């Protein structure tokens, strides 16, 4: 039982680390696409680009931002699940009252 619990905890930790890494990567990509969309819009304003290209770039930037926000939620969920399983959020009855077992 102890090995199973340790293996589950290790897997949960790896998942939390991977989720955070994925979120950071998504955030960097979203920031880059937002800068690209800004430049594309500026080119259109100066008459050097087409509206369709500008709108497509803006759409991609918005989709990347949405993906980054979703990845951030996934990372936070993984982190808080890890904290919950580690009993870092609040004391369980057994932790607060050793020897007392609820009915």
Feature roles, as predicted:
Residues 81-103:
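Terminal intrinsically disordered/low-complexity segments used for targeting and assembly
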Residues 1-67, 74-85:
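Amphipathic alpha-helical coiled-coil segments
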